[in-house]
Structures are given as C-alpha cells and as structure tokens.
C-alpha cells in the first residue's frame, strides 16, 4: 500500500517530467524555470546543453530582500519576472522557453511569466 505522501510526490515528479521532456534550452534560448514552494518562489535561466544555470533569483535573494520581495504572492512574482528579464538582458538573452514545472499556468507562475514578458523576454 502506497502512502499518500508518496503518491503526491511521485505524481508531482511525473507531471514535471512530462512538461520538461518537451522543452530544451540552449545558451541562445535558455529555459526559464519556475519553482514554487510553500513560502518562496525561485526563478532560473538554465542552459540545458551545458547543464549550467545562467541566472537565478528568488524571494530569498539579497536583491529581492532589499526590494521587499520576501513573500510568495502575485505582486512579488511579477517583480521577480521583471528582475529575471533584466538579468537575461545582461546576458544578451531575449528569447526563452518557459518551464512551469509541475504547476498549472495560473496564479504565481503566470505572474512570473507576465513579469518576464513585461521585462522584454519573448516566449
């Protein structure tokens, strides 16, 4: 008999794998990955060919803390999207592949995407 926690975590891993198997990021068009926990949001630009993270920001980062973006809500998620777009522009990245992970494109995840679009990234 499987525990309910095992079902939940394995289902989440399967959903994330299903989304990620269709996505591939490179240095010219990296993967914009959004990870959401109960308290925080993490956003990364990832080059899958090299296996490297090009840029990252979260609600735990010093830049976010000085800006007052320490909580997981939609306003802060949009601001994180704008900031990751600025970091991407510094790396000459203007196109990305959006990776929502195991989460629905809704709420905080959608606001990160909207903020990144506002900041100048194209999906």
UniProtKB/Swiss-Prot annotation:
Disulfide bonds: none
Protein name: Large ribosomal subunit protein uL18
Keyword Transferase: no
Family from the record: Belongs to the universal ribosomal protein uL18 family.
Gene Ontology MF terms: 5S rRNA binding; structural constituent of ribosome
Record keyword Ribosomal protein present: yes
UniProt signal peptide: none
Matches recorded under InterPro entries: Ribosomal_uL18_bac-type, Ribosomal_uL18_bac/euk
Species lineage: Bacteria, Pseudomonadati, Chlamydiota, Chlamydiia, Chlamydiales
Subunit comment: Part of the 50S ribosomal subunit; part of the 5S rRNA/L5/L18/L25 subcomplex. Contacts the 5S and 23S rRNAs.
Cross-referenced Gene3D superfamilies: 3.30.420.100
Keyword entries, A-Z: Ribonucleoprotein, Ribosomal protein, RNA-binding, rRNA-binding
An example Gene Ontology biological process: translation
GO cellular component: cytosolic large ribosomal subunit
Described function: This is one of the proteins that bind and probably mediate the attachment of the 5S RNA into the large ribosomal subunit, where it forms part of the central protuberance.
NCBIfam families documented for this protein: L18_bact
CDD domains for the chain: Ribosomal_L18_L5e
Protein's organism: Chlamydia trachomatis serovar D (strain ATCC VR-885 / DSM 19411 / UW-3/Cx)
């Amino acid at each position: 008999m499987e525990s309910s926690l095992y079902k939940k975590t394995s289902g989440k891993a399967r959903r994330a794998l299903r989304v990620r198997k269709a996505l591939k990021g490179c240095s010219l068009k990296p993967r914009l990955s959004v990870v959401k926990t109960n308290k925080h949001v993490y956003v990364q630009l990832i080059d899958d060919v090299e296996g490297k993270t090009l840029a990252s920001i979260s609600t735990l980062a010093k830049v976010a803390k000085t800006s007052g973006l320490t909580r997981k809500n939609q306003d802060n998620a949009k601001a994180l999207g704008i900031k990751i777009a600025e970091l991407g522009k510094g790396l000459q990245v203007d196109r990305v592949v959006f990776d929502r992970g195991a989460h629905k494109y809704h709420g905080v995840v959608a606001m990160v995407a909207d903020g990144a679009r506002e900041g100048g990234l194209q999906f």
